[in-house]
Structures are given as structure tokens and as C-alpha cells.
Regions:
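Short linear motifs in intrinsically disordered
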Residues: 62-65, 109-111, 131-134
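Bacterial Sec-dependent N-terminal signal peptides
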Residues: 1-32
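Core segments of cupin and vicinal oxygen chelate
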Residues: 35-39, 45-90, 124, 140-142
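Vicinal oxygen chelate
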Residues: 22-49, 68-69, 96-175
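Residue-level signal for short segments within beta-strands and strand-turn junctions
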Residues: 77, 93, 156-158
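A short, acidic/glycine-rich surface segment
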Residues: 92-98, 162-163
Length: 175
């Protein structure tokens, strides 16, 4: 009887430890996956000869609600449809230095989660981090350089503050 009880206790203990370790390992894997998760497109930025004319043309012919920075598209987040998300569309002057060191006429902004941890992971992987993380009321930003030399903007958004800023500027979103 004592031997059977000890065997059952040993099996139960092994099962519990195994379950606990699996949970810890799975959680770490989930955290690592989450750390690198791009949640969407935060912005499309491109060079043009005359940003004002470009904004006017897109407003007139395609109905974009433009402001001094371009247009903001409002959408609902897939993971939680009660939350809004935003994507910025911005024409830049062809002489802008903002896209440097890239020589391309465009830059894409990706929405991400946990920017600090992501940057640390990217550093370990040898990805070129072009600058330091900057923090604004509406989110955190950093630039990286991809494999073809394109400057890429990573944004951990604060959508609530971003929406407030848009309202303060009198900007309407394109839906």
C-alpha cells in the first residue's frame, strides 16, 4: 500500500512539474513571438515634388480627409475590435532628409508591441538600429535599416493620444 501510494505520488508530482515547466516554456515562447509582432502598417511615407498639391489632389479625387501631414486612416483593431487603430499617409518634399540613410523615395512605418524589447532582440540579431527610441505622447519610435538599406520606422502607438492630437489639430480621419 505504501509503495503504491509513493508511486502514485511520484507520478502526480512529475506530472505537475512537467505541466508547470511546459507552461513556463510556452509562456516564454509566446512572449518572444509577441515581442516581434508587427500589428499593422502605421504609415506610408513617400517623397514628391509638391506635398501640398499631392494632398489636394488626393482629397479632391479620392476623398482623403487631408491635413498638413497627409491623411489618417482609422480602422478597428483585429485583436480587439473595440479599439481604434490609425495609419498615417504622408507625402514628403523630395528634398527631405528624413528617409536617410536610405536613398529610396519611400519609408514604411510598422506598428509594433513592446518596442524596447523588440529593439534589444533586433540588436542581438545584428539588425542595424539607426537611432535611439524617441517617445512622444502618441507613441514610441525608432528606425531600423532592412537588408536592402531601406529605412523602416517602428512605432509602438498610443492610439488614444494619437486620436486626441488629431482632434486638437482639427483633423478628420479617412474611414
Amino acid at each position: 500500500m505504501k509503495k503504491t501510494t509513493l508511486i502514485i505520488l511520484a507520478i502526480a508530482t512529475s506530472f505537475c512539474f512537467g505541466f508547470a515547466f511546459k507552461t513556463i516554456i510556452t509562456k516564454q515562447s509566446d512572449d518572444q513571438t509577441k515581442m516581434k509582432k508587427v500589428t499593422g502598417i502605421g504609415g506610408i511615407f513617400f517623397k514628391c515634388k509638391d506635398p501640398n498639391k499631392m494632398r489636394e489632389w488626393y482629397q479632391k479625387h479620392l476623398g482623403l480627409n487631408t491635413n498638413q501631414y497627409g491623411a489618417v486612416f482609422e480602422w478597428r483593431q483585429g485583436a480587439d475590435t473595440t479599439k481604434k487603430g490609425f495609419t498615417q499617409w504622408s507625402p514628403f518634399a523630395e528634398t527631405t532628409k528624413y528617409f536617410e540613410p536610405s536613398t529610396k523615395d519611400f519609408m514604411i512605418n510598422y506598428r509594433v508591441e513592446n518596442l524596447e524589447a523588440l529593439v534589444e532582440e533586433l540588436k542581438k540579431e545584428g539588425v542595424v538600429i539607426a537611432d535611439k527610441i524617441e517617445t512622444a505622447e502618441y507613441g514610441k519610435f525608432v528606425h531600423i535599416i532592412d537588408v536592402e538599406g531601406n529605412k523602416v520606422e517602428l512605432w509602438e502607438p498610443n492610439d488614444i493620444e494619437y486620436e486626441k492630437l488629431g482632434k486638437q489639430l482639427g483633423s478628420m480621419t479617412t474611414k
